[in-house]
Each structure stands twice: as C-alpha cells, then as structure tokens.
Amino acid sequence: NYGYTFGSGTRLTVV
C-alpha cells in the first residue's frame, strides 16, 4: 500500500 513515481512519470503502486 505505497506508491512510487518514476522520473518519467510512470507510476508504480504496491499494496
């Protein structure tokens, strides 16, 4: 349950 945004704007969301 946390999110991470890459420099290119791609978003990764994990439980």
Curated annotation (Swiss-Prot):
Q: Which residues form the signal peptide?
A: none
Where primarily located? membrane
Cellular component per GO, a single term: T cell receptor complex
Task: Share an example GO biological-process annotation for this protein.
Answer: adaptive immune response
Its keywords, alphabetically, are: Adaptive immunity, Cell membrane, Immunity, Membrane, Receptor, T cell receptor
Question: What is the annotated localization of this protein?
Answer: Cell membrane
> What is the role of the protein in this entry?
J region of the variable domain of T cell receptor (TR) beta chain that participates in the antigen recognition. Alpha-beta T cell receptors are antigen specific receptors which are essential to the immune response and are present on the cell surface of T lymphocytes. Recognize peptide-major histocompatibility (MH) (pMH) complexes that are displayed by antigen presenting cells (APC), a prerequisite for efficient T cell adaptive immunity against pathogens.
Assembly, in brief, is:
Alpha-beta TR is a heterodimer composed of an alpha and beta chain; disulfide-linked. The alpha-beta TR is associated with the transmembrane signaling CD3 coreceptor proteins to form the TR-CD3 (TcR or TCR). The assembly of alpha-beta TR heterodimers with CD3 occurs in the endoplasmic reticulum where a single alpha-beta TR heterodimer associates with one CD3D-CD3E heterodimer, one CD3G-CD3E heterodimer and one CD247 homodimer forming a stable octameric structure. CD3D-CD3E and CD3G-CD3E heterodimers preferentially associate with TR alpha and TR beta chains, respectively.
| Name this polypeptide is given | T cell receptor beta joining 1-2
The organism is Homo sapiens
Q: Which gene encodes it?
A: TRBJ1-2
